């Protein structure tokens, strides 16, 4: 420490008693535990911020597959087996995955849907390796048995069929993905590619309904393409929600809210954002909309993206908040269009300067 000051346990304990909801409370709590003398009462635990459901949009729920009755120990073993399968596929070791599927361990721990999940993943591995017949051989039966739970199995069969010029099969499986998946990005992509398969297969009467499905997700890549092909206008909402006095009053009623407003006033926006991020975890829908307005107006792009995604998981929220343009300028100014830079930052880190990937990439643009 620059002043060589060493905090005493009583100071840390008193601090935790007052500020257990502080963003740095967990670090101070760990330090207090290390400094705690024997037989002293422990410090107050840091506040656990729960994530409340504040969705203002809708995402189609996936059906829950039947589960095999397992003990807690067996569930851990099954999860470990799935991790091993994913690791083998990342390495391209398809033979190792086949051996795992044929093992007594897999038959003992995996349900039918679990086995089909592994078969579909193996099919995806073969597709990535350019072995389309093998991809269909493994993912096809999995899609037939468990496709309603595993739309990714249909996706693998569809892509492999397309590459083999089996357009009728490709269209059928793409349509199955569009019907069963719950991701707007996947649904729009599947519907668009199903339309393309019908176009190549000379079934023009089936194209427009599928493009209309894709066009219903206008914030996705394939949704935008579909809308352009149908001659539809993209109705983006570049405004941000209004900041109402009720939001400020609500923030003033909590310690975290008061701290955040004070920090914004003295220019400590990053620290204020951490306070508001914690507060958003227990905010109701009205307060969450208010926090979105605050984040959009005070240069908090990471919080704005996070809140807009939570409030509108199916899209259709405030595009000005979901695709922010923060008041950031690099030394020497921008040499390329700043919209492109911000687009890359949103994709790579969602504007979190402390983002770190498992591969070691760091920062806003996830540089290695």
Predicted regions and their residues:
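Non-catalytic accessory/assembly modules
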Residues: 20-78, 82-88, 96-100, 134, ...
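Catalytic glycan-binding domains that act on GlcNAc-containing polysaccharides
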Residues: 1-22, 31, 49, 103-122, ...
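TPR-adjacent "capping" and linker segments in tetratricopeptide-repeat scaffold/adaptor proteins
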Residues: 65-80, 108-115, 241-254
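Active-site substrate-binding loop specific to GH73 endo-beta-N-acetylglucosaminidase modules
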Residues: 152, 224-251, 255, 262
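Short coil/linker segments at helix-helix boundaries
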Residues: 2, 6-16, 38-58, 63, ...
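Long, internal scaffold/assembly segments composed of regular secondary structure
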Residues: 250, 260-266, 272-275, 280
């Amino acid at each position: 420490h620059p002043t060589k000051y060493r905090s005493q346990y009583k100071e840390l304990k008193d601090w935790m008693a007052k500020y257990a909801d502080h963003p740095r409370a967990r670090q101070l709590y760990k330090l207090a535990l290390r400094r705690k003398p024997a037989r002293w009462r422990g410090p107050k635990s840091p506040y656990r911020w729960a994530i409340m459901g504040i969705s203002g949009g809708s995402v189609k729920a996936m059906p829950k597959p039947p589960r095999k009755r397992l003990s807690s120990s067996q569930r851990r073993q099954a999860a470990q087996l799935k991790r091993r399968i994913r690791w083998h596929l990342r390495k391209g070791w398809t033979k190792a995955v086949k051996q795992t599927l044929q093992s007594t361990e897999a038959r003992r721990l995996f349900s039918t849907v679990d086995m089909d999940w592994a078969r579909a993943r193996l099919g995806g591995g073969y597709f990535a390796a350019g072995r389309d017949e093998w991809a269909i051989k493994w993912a096809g039966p999995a899609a037939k048995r468990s496709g309603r739970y595993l739309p990714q199995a249909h996706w693998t069969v569809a892509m492999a069929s397309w590459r083999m010029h089996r357009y009728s099969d490709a269209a059928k499986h793409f349509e199955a993905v569009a019907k069963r998946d719950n991701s707007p990005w996947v649904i729009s992509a599947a519907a668009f590619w199903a339309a393309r398969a019908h176009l190549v297969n000379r079934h023009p009467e089936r194209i427009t309904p599928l493009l209309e499905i894709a066009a219903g997700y206008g914030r996705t890549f394939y949704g935008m393409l579909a809308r352009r092909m149908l001659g539809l206008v993209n109705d983006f909402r570049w405004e941000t929600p209004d900041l109402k006095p009720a939001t400020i009053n609500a923030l003033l009623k909590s310690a975290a809210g008061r701290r955040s407003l004070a920090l914004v006033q003295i220019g400590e926006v990053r620290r204020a954002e951490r306070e508001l991020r914690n507060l958003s975890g227990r905010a109701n829908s009205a307060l969450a909309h208010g926090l979105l307005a605050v984040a959009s107006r005070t240069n908090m792009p990471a919080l704005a993206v996070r809140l807009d995604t939570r409030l509108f998981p199916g899209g259709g929220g405030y595009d000005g908040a979901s695709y922010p343009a923060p008041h950031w300028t690099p030394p020497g100014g921008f040499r390329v269009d700043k919209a492109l830079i911000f687009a890359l930052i949103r994709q790579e880190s969602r504007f979190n300067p402390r983002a770190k990937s498992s591969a070691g990439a760091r920062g806003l643009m996830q540089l290695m």
